[in-house]
Structure formats: structure tokens, C-alpha cells
Amino acid sequence: MNAPNLVAFLVVALVGCGGSQKSKVAKLQKRVDYLEDKIEAMSDDDGASVVLAERVEAHEERLGKLETQANRVPRRLPTRPRPDPNAVYSVGVTGRPSVGAKNAWVTVVKASEFACPFCERARPTMDTLLKDYKGDIRIVYRHFVVHPQSATIPAHAACAAHKQGKFKKMYNLIWDRGFKAGRDLSKANMIKLGRQAGLKIPKMKKDMEGDCPKIVREDQSALQKVGVLGTPAFYINGRFLSGARPVSQFKVLVDEELAKAKASGIPRKDYYQHIVKTGLKKFTP
């Protein structure tokens, strides 16, 4: 079943169930199970699987409400544990590419990959934050590859660009002339974009085959430890926020963290290091 048919199937599952509440729960659960299996079977190039996965989560919530109305009919309700949004996690940034104030009061770590449509959707949100909190915020980029067949090569290319001091230029080129241009994330296109970014191509190729695979794996491992399961995910001075949310939701956390940082008595240049030192080193479900 292709993505459009799956979406239609999902709508029918939500509005087309008749009978008792218990019957609705049973039928909806079967459909959710079916959709989960289909999502897992989808090609990792298919961004629609990400969309459907989020919709399934929303429908799981509806199923929970139906269960309450049906006197808590027993069923399997798989949930993905997520980090506590009020907790502060230790997310290192040493040596990773960043944009914004070097000694910022607020550090936003963005966990993302280049095959994720929601990661691209969050790109202008990050630009808005950099503009509206100029001098007080920085965005640090770390790789979290969900679709290895399509997202690994551009991650290596972005890493190689960072080694030549041109990460942001390459980052935007990959999105604009790679992902948004027919999702051409091939090595050949990355080399082409590297030339456009002004990279030294022999060094780029060497780094893509040398240090960068290790660096990307290190990012993946570090982010998994603090609870990242999908993309995009963000840590705002160590506080978790997931998904391509409206900029207003980011600003709520940024404002809270900015006020907290300024009132801490800790020098600006030392503040994020204090978070890394004192934050939770691991997410425990």
C-alpha cells in the first residue's frame, strides 16, 4: 500500500468505525497495528513514513481516550518514552558546528538528518531564533541519522565542510539543492555542492572517508544516551523539545532559559559548560 492509500486508510480507521466503544477500540487497534507494520516496511527514502508515524502516535492518544470511555478495555498500548521536558540533560557541543553567539546564554542543540522533511521545516525556525535573540543564542548542529541509506552521505559531506570552516553554507546547499531538488543526496551531488560552497574537494573527499564517519557515529551515540529516538530533536540549555514546532513554543523555553541564565551569577562564557557538567548524563525511561 502506497503512502496516499495509507493516509486514506487512516482516515477511514478514525471515522468509519461503528458499534460499541469496545468494538471501536478493537478495530482501531488492529488498524494502528497494521499501519505500524507498514511504516516499518516502507523504504527509508520515503519521508511519508515519518508523517505517518507521527499520525499513528496521535491516534494512539485517541485510542487511550476510547479505552477510558469503554471502561478501560485491556489492550497493548506501545509508547515511546521521551526525555522529561523539565529535566536538564548534558549534551556536549565541543568541536561541533554552530551558528550564533560564541558565548551565548542559551545553546540550542539540534539533532537532525538531511533526509527528514521535518528537519528542513525547522530550519527557518532556527533562523528566526538567531535573529530575535541575536547575541544571546547559538544553534549547535549534531547528526542523528534515521535513514542511513539516504542521510549518511550528506552527513559526512556536512562534516567535511565544517572541517574547512564552511558548514552553514554547505548545510543550506544540501537542503536547497539536494533535499529540495529531488532529494538528490548522492555522493556525486555532495561533491558538486562542495565545489559550490568553495571547499577543497580532495580534502573533502578524504574527510568524508576518514574522520567524518566516526564523528557522525559519535553524534548518534551521544544523542541516543540522552533520549533522542527521531528527528528533529532539540535541547535548549539541556531541556528537550521534539518536532518541527511553531517558533512560539521554542521562544517559551528560550525565554525561560535566558532569564535563568542571567540570574545564575555564572559568567556567560562558562554557563553552558556548567549545564554540561551538572546535567543528566543519560536518559532513563
Regions found by a protein language model. Give the residues of each.
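Exposed boundary/loop context
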Residues: 9-11, 93, 236
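C-terminal motif of bacterial Sec signal peptides marking the signal peptidase cleavage site
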Residues: 14-16
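Extracytoplasmic thiol/disulfide redox context detector
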Residues: 19-147, 214-220, 259, 263-285
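Cysteine-centric redox/oxidoreductase cores and disulfide-bonded domains
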Residues: 5, 145-285
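Bacterial N-terminal signal peptides that target proteins for export
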Residues: 1-7
